[in-house]
Amino acid sequence: MKIMLTEFFNTFVKVTGWLPQKIAFRTKIEYEDKAVQGRRIKGPAIIISNHTSVFDYAVLLFVFFTRTLRVQMAEVLFQKQPLGLFLKMMGGIYVNRDTHDFSFMGKSEELLRTGKVVGIFPESRLPLKNEERPLPFKPSAAYIALAADVPVIPVYTNGSYFNLKKRAHVIIGTPMNVHDFADDARSEKENIDRLTNAMRERIIRLGRMLDDTANEKK
């Protein structure tokens, strides 16, 4: 019943928010290979994305319109009302970065095992002004992907929201097969580290591809 209510509320928000988000973001979607991975996601998957703004979440909702995204969210967002209630109704996965509570990982794995799509921002926070982007990735996304044995879909956004001169650009990458990083000859930590590093490299590569596409169109 709770899952049905979450999916209903997501659908309501996306239908009623479609026009406002078109005006606010004007999102242009590019693809690494559309024949392999477009906007439709079949079966369980993890979406990873670079993190530029709290509005990254909203953009992902509409990029992958046909699926209900269960996105990991920091505790600070749930502490602000009525935002916290809204995110809870949207099915946000509570992540408390100030404690050693890893229940969000079990919750994410459980959702994936029932065919759902989980969204993760592996940087775990917004970069500061002078920090190199993307920030180093936390290992939890790789751990969950390997444990649940699901593909990882990388997404890069330029973070240009509410900008009349420059629209939002998003590029969807081809899925990463976690089996390529699950080597029985290595330790669990080594496999997690390999996948974590590979995910960050894919995000960086997608960012460069998006920049190249933008330069070609000038």
Where are these regions (language model features)?
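A structural micro-motif
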Residues: 27, 67-69, 90, 116, ...
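A transmembrane-helix-recognition feature enriched in membrane-embedded lipid enzymes
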Residues: 1-34, 81-90
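Non-catalytic C-terminal accessory region of glycerolipid acyltransferases
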Residues: 4-8, 105-218
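Catalytic core of membrane glycerolipid acyltransferases/transacylases, capturing the structured
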Residues: 39-99
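A conditional alpha-helix N-cap/helix-loop micro-motif detector
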Residues: 98-101, 134
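Short amphipathic alpha-helix with an adjacent loop that forms part of the alpha/beta core around
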Residues: 33-40, 109-110
